[in-house]
A protein has these predicted regions:
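Beta-propeller domains
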Residues: 1-41, 47-75, 109-110, 118-121, 130-137, 141-290
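Asp-box/WD-like beta-propeller blade repeats and closely related beta-sheet repeat scaffolds
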Residues: 61-144
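Short, conserved, GDST-rich strand-edge loop motifs in beta-rich repeat architectures
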Residues: 38-44, 48, 101-110, 152-173, ...
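Blade-level signature of beta-propeller repeat domains, shared across WD40, Kelch, NHL, RCC1
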Residues: 323-405
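Short loop/turn segments immediately following beta-strands, especially the blade-tip
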Residues: 2-7, 58-68, 120-121, 180-186, ...
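Surface-exposed loop and turn segments in beta-propeller and other repeat-based domains
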Residues: 12-29, 71-84, 127-135, 188-199, ...
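Structural signature of eukaryotic scaffold interfaces centered on beta-propeller domains
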Residues: 23-43, 84-94, 141-147, 203-211, ...
């Protein structure tokens, strides 16, 4: 990623997983700022769950930063037998230990639960004491000073893995609620029903400021941003603050939704970034007033609307999907694959073309974003055939790895 490097914008190493069919999806570190008081901990290991295989790969990124190596594999069959959980998704460290949201039970049915690992990556058991009336799992984020965790909903692995069927939304097989937990007691205590405004409420983010109770959720199918906060009376409130309109398409029987599959907040809590995977745009909003976001930047790349079919000389298959921001808020790296079966359904050409990663240059002082013309990684050119890219992490820290106590 250094423009002065002779291998700028190139793949310099590939680490093959030992199994087949893992589908590496999200990932997270073994340590973050929440274990600042434990001198034995360092950000050395990256945990890569296989959402299909249920295997969790622990990768050593520190011994040789240019050639990460496999440290350990936590077997998915062992996880199932010890916890009755499958479908590993979001990884967060908790002090020196690790919590991973699991989207299903051993048979792939919802709601799943939370896997608890110790710092040696041994299975402790299930983290939660109860799932209450929660129907589905997906993402989670916590604010320890307020003793709160928020979790969101996708669907059961058996529902989302084969592909997306709109009728299953109507059959209530996809989520439309977010949940507030008593973090210390490890039990859900309040549910917010978002209804049509919150279909497929995927990523959830609190402000980085540990004193803040403001947080945000991107509802993928509704293409809305939901804002929540705790009011002066101590009650949790929510509102819809961003609504991306569906767009007409000549080949679609209905207007195309944006499919806002990810959101991100800059480290200073000033900007919120979101994607519209089917439309093909990335957006930047100033959220200095979290009740009234202001659109400050927009970049087009791929998507179904045909506004930017080619980026830096590479034909795009897919749209902006996952993204990660540098700590200084200036470099936003964006990838294009959502989930293999969903990719194949909406962007079938990705099978032959593979995914890409691009860099968007952001202006944290004045707002605004522009596509970097010098950087693109074309994973369609991989030696073992076209590959797809999902989540990115920065070894030195990024904007979704740390939770402050």
């Amino acid at each position: 990623v250094d423009p002065d490097s002779p291998t700028y914008s190139q793949v310099i190493h590939r680490l093959e997983m030992p199994g087949i069919g893992d589908e590496l999806h999200h990932m997270g570190w073994n340590a973050c700022s929440s274990c600042f008081d434990d001198g034995s901990m360092s950000r050395k290991y990256l945990l890569l769950p296989g959402v299909r295989s249920n295997n969790i790969h622990v990768v050593d990124t520190a011994s040789d930063p240019r050639a990460p190596r496999l440290h350990k594999v936590i077997d998915g069959a062992e996880i199932k037998s010890k916890t009755n959980l499958s479908g590993p998704h979001t990884v967060h460290c908790l002090g020196s230990e690790i919590i991973i949201s699991m989207l299903g039970d051993a048979k792939g049915e919802a709601p799943g639960g939370y896997l608890h690992l110790n710092k040696d990556f041994d299975i402790v058991g299930r983290w939660e004491n109860s799932m209450g009336d929660i129907k589905f799992g997906y993402d989670f984020w916590y604010q320890p000073r307020h003793n709160v965790m928020v979790s969101s909903e996708w669907a059961a692995p058996n529902t989302f893995m084969p592909g997306f069927d709109l009728e299953e939304v109507g059959h209530l097989k996809y989520g439309r609620e977010i949940h507030f937990w008593d973090f210390e007691k490890k039990v859900p205590i309040e549910t917010m029903y978002l209804g049509e405004d919150g279909l497929l409420p995927l990523e959830v983010k609190f402000h980085h400021d540990p004193d803040s109770t403001h947080g945000f959720c991107g509802a993928a199918l509704s293409s809305n941003v939901i804002h929540w906060w705790r009011d002066e009376a101590g009650k949790w409130q929510w509102e819809k603050i961003i609504d991306v309109a569906n767009e007409p398409h000549p080949e679609w029987p209905i207007p195309v939704p944006g499919v806002m599959s990810a959101i991100l907040i800059s480290m200073d809590d000033k900007y919120l970034y979101l994607n519209n995977w089917l439309h093909g745009d990335m957006r930047q909003y100033d959220i200095s007033d979290p009740h009234n976001p202001v659109l400050t930047g927009q970049v087009w790349m791929g998507g179904l609307l045909g506004k930017a079919p080619e980026v830096n000389g590479v034909k795009m298959a897919g749209g902006p999907q996952m993204f990660q921001l540098s700590l200084d808020g200036r470099r936003l790296y964006v990838t294009t694959s959502l989930f293999s079966t969903w990719d194949n359904q909406f962007y079938p050409e990705i099978r032959e073309q593979g995914g890409v990663m691009v860099q968007i240059d952001c202006d944290p002082e004045n707002g605004g974003m522009t596509l970097n013309k010098d950087f693109i990684v074309d994973f369609g050119q991989e030696p073992n055939g076209p590959s797809r890219c999902h989540e990115a992490r920065y070894p030195g820290g990024d904007c979704t790895s740390d939770i402050w106590l």
